[in-house]
Amino acid sequence: MTALSDYFKDLRDIYNTGSAVRETSYYSTFETMTNAYGKELKPRVRCVINLQNKGAGIPDAGFFTASQFQRGENEPRAGQLPERGCAEIKSTREDVLKIAASEQVAKYLEFYGAVLVTNYRDFLLIGKDAHGKAEHLERFPFAESEAEFWKEVRADASAFAAKFETSFAEFIKRVFLHAVPLTKPEDVAWFLASYAREAKEQVERAKDLPSLQALRKTLEEALGMTFRGEEGEHFFRSTLIQTLFYGVFSAWVLWSKKNEADEKFDWRTASHELKVPMIAALYYQVAEPTQLKKLGLVELLNQSNKVLNRIVKQEFFRKFSESHAVQYLHFRNGLNFKHFSVIINRMLLV
């Protein structure tokens, strides 16, 4: 069993009693699920239900790091705020976007800096943009409606969870790490690898999409090889994702050398920095909504773009070496590196 499978089963069991309060009866399932993912991070992140009113109301939950829990006989530190933001939890009947637009969430955002809004079946992370205004950062819905959600969970919670386990785990960990200042290459690599793994999953699910053939041709011509058979198909999809995400990172590295610290990077317009024609061709095809909209790669590249714009450049480049770019951006979980270092080296050429 997995954390998400357990979450769905717990929700189902509480629902099946017929005696549950729509919102609060399920708090424990949210706490258990988020703690299961939080303990995999360093430092660990732990969910605490119902925080004190510090002036903005009583959040349904807050996300604290391990260092915030006082050890030994010392008294707890008074007035601590959760380092990784808070949560606003409503019943499955509520709409996440309407919850997000509420005055209460606005107060939490101003006070805590980040709010995870959820109705147990749909998750939305809200943060602040460069001007301090509310911004919807990432969203993860399990179903389009309350009825559909309960139907799936009650029919087979494990099978339903299996559809989302990897991608949701990546999402919830990104939620916990959103507030962390990005100064280390390995932290940036974690975020980009997280989006890359999710992108690879999406491409795997859409492997029969005819529009992928155009991308295949572009890569085959660039690499001087042909993707054949099942192994070739796997290598093609892995190489596609690596090319896109390494490309966007490499473009950011070169772009950063020429632009002021307060300017914002845009992966769509900065790809020419790489001076690699195949990257420009790939980006054009991926960004073309009529061709590859179903893949969802544009949204994942947009999220990666936001990560790059969060980097504290001066500190980052003190620790970063271009010669180690491939090492820093090691996309695990089945992404093949065969023949790929040549492409990366070309991307980083000024």
Tell what function each PLM region has.
Residues 53-55, 63-67, 90-94, 333-336:
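Short, flexible loop/turn elements at secondary-structure junctions
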Residues 66, 71-298:
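Charged, often flexible domain-edge or linker segments that flank or initiate folded functional domains
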Residues 1-41, 45-50, 247, 266-269, ...:
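Charged, often low-complexity linker/regulatory segments
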Residues 30-33, 37, 59-63, 85-87:
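Central hydrophobic cores of alpha-helical transmembrane segments in multi-pass inner-membrane proteins
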Residues 41-80:
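Active-site metal-binding core of divalent-cation-utilizing nuclease and nuclease-like domains
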Residues 257, 261, 272, 279, ...:
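Class I S-adenosyl-L-methionine
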Residues 24, 28, 99-102, 213, ...:
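Conserved structured core elements
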Residues 2-6, 211-227, 327-348:
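Active-site-adjacent bridging/hinge elements
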